[in-house]
């Protein structure tokens, strides 16, 4: 005789929808668990008698019920819906911008991150490419579904994807750092000090900690949260009615400012936030909520960025044009991209990097000399780079094994109530501090070797960096 008990966990904050299934067959208990909509992981344990098997199964069920799980019917909850940003991109009538190089990723691209070493692009097919500043491909990953955005948090680079996972790209295998509930139609993500902010189609905004546990969630009267930005001051949420700021600790609303059009993109600098809107403007606000300069464009704004401290403000519209303004709101120039409308953009060292509806990562020279030459009709010869053949990336749960930790740091997995936690066992670290570590590769009593362990910015937990291997006995 077989007995099946099926449970689900559905946190109100919408960040954890998981299942737990216990199947008892004679003397065997099989436990399967994971995210709703996925196959999950399974464990099987044999017992000396059917009675002992039933008692073990009942104990496991009680543990889950006490931690928030509830009885449910399998299959009633649907997999996540996905909203992909759509721009009906028109050709620009402005002069061509001075493009230095453009990389054809192969599919519409939403994710971009630029630093002194690398230029990263993530596209609709889940392909991520890292280029140097001359446009040469240095690295690539292939993720299961489309990339919504690329987000940096200190030295960590993350990819938020349509499958609801946020992947850490610091090692050679992308690892799942956060798993967002299937009923959340994700619009945008941001991360600061290991805390993930999520905004969605329904106007909700939530903050999730480094253990993938909800800190708080706010249901608003708005919708279409295309902007969420994390800062020391709070979480800034841009939506159908403007921009709202929430307190980091408990999600208390600090201020709200209305915009005439819906917010379609957001940016922040040290003391300001910027919202590109459907009414062809960029609204700026101080981080204390005071309205500041409004930047007027000719079409709906789907991306924006600034030079250091807002000295210049850049914008991209749905007519394949980019704009530049000074701090006072004066338009300095408007030029065509030549490669579609910008879904996202970043500025660095007199260059604007855009990712577009045509799937390009384009590097545009916005120095005064280059812009003046472009306005006069003189353009550089743009280097055109095609994407290399896509290389398969191992699944996020793939683990190499080693019997020698070498210079790595050893971690151990242990049970803490209903949760599996991690601690550092290598001498010299605080063994009582928790560790941010992928949930879907944790196995009780297992040991792992990681390239590096670094303290979080606030010093209250550790974060892994680089490659992860399973430590085994020789």
Regions found by a protein language model. Name each.
Residues 456-474:
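OB-fold/S1-family single-stranded nucleic acid-binding modules
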Residues 111-112, 150, 189, 227-228, ...:
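Hydrophobic core register within WD40 beta-propeller blades
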Residues 426-444:
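Beta-strand/loop nucleic-acid-binding surfaces
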Residues 396-420:
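Structural detector for short beta-strands of small beta-barrel domains
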Residues 339-389:
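Blade-level signature of beta-propeller repeat domains, shared across WD40, Kelch, NHL, RCC1
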């Amino acid at each position: 005789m077989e007995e099946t008990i099926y449970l689900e966990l559905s946190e109100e904050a919408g960040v954890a929808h998981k299942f737990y299934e216990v199947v008892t067959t004679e003397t065997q208990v099989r436990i399967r668990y994971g995210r709703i909509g996925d196959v999950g992981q399974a464990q099987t344990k044999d017992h000396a008698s059917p009675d002992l098997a039933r008692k073990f199964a009942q104990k496991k069920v009680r543990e889950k019920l006490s931690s928030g799980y509830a009885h449910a019917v399998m299959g009633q909850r649907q997999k996540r819906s996905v909203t992909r940003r759509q721009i009906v991109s028109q050709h620009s009538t402005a002069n061509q911008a001075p493009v230095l190089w453009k990389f054809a990723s192969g599919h519409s691209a939403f994710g971009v991150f630029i630093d002194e070493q690398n230029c990263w692009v993530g596209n609709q097919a889940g392909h991520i490419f890292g280029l140097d500043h001359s446009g040469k491909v240095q690295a690539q990953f292939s993720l299961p579904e489309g990339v919504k955005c690329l987000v940096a948090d200190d030295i960590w680079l993350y990819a938020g994807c349509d499958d609801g996972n946020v992947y850490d790209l610091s090692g050679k295998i992308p690892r799942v750092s956060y798993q967002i509930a299937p009923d959340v139609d994700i619009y945008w993500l941001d991360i600061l000090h290991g805390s993930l902010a999520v905004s969605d189609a329904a106007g909700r905004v939530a903050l999730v900690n480094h253990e993938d546990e909800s800190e708080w969630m706010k249901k608003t009267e708005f919708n279409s949260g295309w902007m969420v930005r994390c800062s020391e001051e709070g979480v800034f949420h841009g939506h159908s009615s403007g921009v709202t700021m929430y307190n980091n600790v408990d999600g208390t609303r600090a201020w709200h400012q209305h915009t005439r059009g819906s917010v379609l993109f957001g940016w922040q600098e040290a003391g300001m936030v910027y919202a590109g809107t459907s009414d062809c403007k960029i609204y700026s606000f101080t981080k204390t909520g005071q309205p500041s300069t409004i930047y007027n464009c000719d079409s709906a704004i789907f991306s924006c960025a600034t030079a250091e401290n807002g000295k210049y403000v850049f914008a991209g519209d749905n007519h394949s044009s980019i704009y530049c303004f000074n701090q006072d709101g004066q338009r300095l120039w408007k030029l065509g991209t030549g490669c579609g409308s910008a879904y996202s953009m970043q500025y660095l060292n007199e260059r604007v990097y855009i990712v577009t509806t045509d799937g390009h990562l384009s590097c545009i020279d916005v120095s005064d000399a280059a812009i003046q030459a472009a306005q006069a009709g003189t353009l550089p010869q743009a280097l055109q780079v095609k994407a290399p053949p896509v290389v398969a990336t191992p699944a996020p749960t793939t683990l190499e094994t080693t019997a020698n930790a070498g210079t790595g740091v050893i971690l151990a997995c242990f049970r803490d109530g209903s949760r599996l936690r991690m601690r550092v066992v290598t001498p010299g670290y605080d063994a009582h501090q928790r560790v941010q570590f992928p949930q879907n590769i944790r196995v009780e009593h297992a040991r792992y070797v990681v390239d590096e362990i670094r303290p979080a910015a606030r010093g209250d937990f550790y974060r892994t960096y680089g490659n992860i291997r399973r430590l085994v006995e020789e």
